[in-house]
Amino acid sequence: MLNIKWIRENQELFDEKLSQRFIEPMSSKIAMLDREKRKITSLIQEFQHARKVKSKILGNMVSKSGEEFEELQRDVNHINEKLEELEQTLDNNNELNELLNMLPNIPDEEVPYGIDESMNKLVRSYGNTNKNALNKQHFELGTKLNLMDFEQTAKISGSRFVTLKGDLAKLERALINFMVDIHTKEFDFFEISPPLLVRDSAMYNAGQLPKFSEESFITTNGYRLIPTAEVSLVNIVADTIIQREKLPMRYVAYTTCFRSEAGSSGRDTRGMIRLHQFGKVELVSITTPEESKNEHEYITNASETILKKLDLPYRVMLLCTGDMGFAAKKTYDIEVWLPGQNQYREIASCSNCGDFQARRMKARYKEFGSNETTLVHTLNASGLPIGRTIVAILENYQNNDGSITIPDVLINYMGGLKKITTYSE
C-alpha cells in the first residue's frame, strides 16, 4: 500500500508516477477522501476527550442524583451516540482504502519509462547462445524420451499439467536440492518449509489481493493456494517489530505453487512453460530502506549464480514502468536462452518492493534502545522455478540422438548419472 502522507505532500509527483504506470491522475480524489476521513477522525477524538472529561467528573461527584448529575449523564449518553454514529460512518467509508488497495507501487527513479516488455533495458548477459545448434523444443525431447507425459496427465487433471517420470523426476529433485544448497551455503539464506494454504489476509499483505483475486485458487473453506512462496515468506514478519541488528533476514523455500493463469488463454499452451502447478525455489529478504538497493543486487546475483553454475546462457533485463509487477518499485527479469524457441524467456523475477508490502502487513524495525519504529523493505526473487530450469537444461544440453547431457554441477545430485536417455517401460 502507498503512503497516504507522501501522496498528500506530493500530489503532482504522485500523478506523474501514476502516469508512468498508465493510470489516470488520482491525487485530487484521494486528497478529498483523505480530508473527509481525517475530519471524521478528528471529531471522534474530540468526542472521546469530552467523554473522558465528563465521565471523570461524574465519577468524582459525591451525589449520584440531582439535576447536575443527570445532565452530565445525558451528555455522556449523547456523546456515546455521536461516537457510535461517527465510528460507523468511518467504518462504512471504505472508498479511500479500496482505492489505495488497487494502486500499484510507485516506480523507482532508476526504472525506465515504457509501455511493455519491448521497452525493457538490457543490463547484462552471460554465456554463448550458439554453443548448441540443435533446436528441438523441450516437450518434443521429453516426450520422445518417454519421461514427460502431457496426454495421460490431461485425462487426470486437464490442460496445463505435466507428469515427469524416471530420470526427469530425478532431475527435478536434484535441482531442488542443488538450488537450496547454493542459497543456504553460499548466500546465507535461511531455509523455510512454509504452508501452501494461506488466508486472504496473507495474500493481501503480499499484494496479491484484492487486485489479483482471479489468478489464485481458493479452497471450499476459504484458504488460498499460494501462487508463490513469497506470500508465506514475507508474512513471517507481519505485525512484528524487528531489532535492527537482526536485519537483513534472508529466507529461501522450495514449494509447489498454484496459478489459475487467468488471462493467459492461448499462451504457451504446449509444454512446461506455463502450468497450473509447478515447483519453485523462492528467495525473500527483509532489510532496511538504506540497504534495500544493495540487497536487490545481492538477491539478483543469487538467482544468476544458479544459471551460471548450470552454464545456461541468460540475460538480465531492467523492467520498464509498463511491465513491472503490482507490488514492485524496481524489478530485474532474468531471461534464459531456449534454443528450441530461438529466444530468451523469463526464468526469474527479482523485485524490490520497498515498504509497499510492509505497510500492508505492519512490519517494522527499530534501533536498539529506541522506541521509534520504521517500516522494513521487502525483496523477493525466483531462485529458480524448477520446471523452467528443466526446460532450459533439456534444450541447451540436447544431443543428436535425443539424449540429454547432465550439467557437471548436477552429476553428484543425480547419483553419478551423466546422461538422460530413453526410458522403456
Curated annotation (Swiss-Prot):
**Which keywords appear in this protein's UniProt record, sorted alphabetically?**
Aminoacyl-tRNA synthetase, ATP-binding, Cytoplasm, Ligase, Nucleotide-binding, Protein biosynthesis
Q: What is its EC number?
A: 6.1.1.11
Query: Which SUPFAM superfamilies does the protein's record reference?
Result: Class II aaRS and biotin synthetases, tRNA-binding arm
The entry's localization annotation reads: Cytoplasm
Q: Which GO terms describe its molecular function?
A: ATP binding; serine-tRNA ligase activity
- Positions that bind L-serine: 228-230, 282, 382
Q: In which pathway does this enzyme or protein participate?
A: Aminoacyl-tRNA biosynthesis; selenocysteinyl-tRNA(Sec) biosynthesis; L-seryl-tRNA(Sec) from L-serine and tRNA(Sec): step 1/1
Q: How does it assemble?
A: Homodimer. The tRNA molecule binds across the dimer.
- Assigned protein family: Belongs to the class-II aminoacyl-tRNA synthetase family. Type-1 seryl-tRNA synthetase subfamily.
**What domain notes does the record hold?**
Consists of two distinct domains, a catalytic core and a N-terminal extension that is involved in tRNA binding.
Quote the protein name from its UniProt record: Serine--tRNA ligase
Q: Which organism is it from?
A: Rickettsia typhi (strain ATCC VR-144 / Wilmington)
The UniProt gene name for this protein comes to serS
